[in-house]
Amino acid sequence: MSRSIKKGPFADAHLLKKVDEQQAAEKKQVIKTWSRRSTIFPSFVGLTIAVYDGRKHVPVFVTEDMVGHKLGEFVPTRTFRGHKADDKASK
């Protein structure tokens, strides 16, 4: 279920503050965040945001196609290591 239209999109205030500071600065740096739940706004386009996946911060370069999605959608939290090998196949 999607978010109510009357509520509008959500983004953490501390992330918005960091984005505004970054756009005012001449030199672009990576913005570190733990806020996977924040919606990507058009003002984020062109910035690199390092999103926490539970182990490390993974850098995500924001493009126009990402606007409206959540930051956490672009950083998987689980590592798939493969299924167990079949013992019958080895014999």
Swiss-Prot record:
GO terms for biological process: ribosomal small subunit assembly; translation. SUPFAM superfamilies: Ribosomal protein S19 (SSF54570). One of its GO terms (molecular function) is rRNA binding. GO terms for cellular component: cytoplasm; small ribosomal subunit. Keywords: Ribonucleoprotein, Ribosomal protein, RNA-binding, rRNA-binding. It comes from the Bacteria. InterPro entries: Ribosomal_uS19 (IPR002222), Ribosomal_uS19_bac-type (IPR005732), Ribosomal_uS19_CS (IPR020934), Ribosomal_uS19_SF (IPR023575). This is Small ribosomal subunit protein uS19. NCBIfam families: rpsS_bact. It holds the Pfam family Ribosomal_S19. Protein S19 forms a complex with S13 that binds strongly to the 16S ribosomal RNA. It comes from Lactobacillus delbrueckii subsp. bulgaricus (strain ATCC 11842 / DSM 20081 / BCRC 10696 / JCM 1002 / NBRC 13953 / NCIMB 11778 / NCTC 12712 / WDCM 00102 / Lb 14). Belongs to the universal ribosomal protein uS19 family.
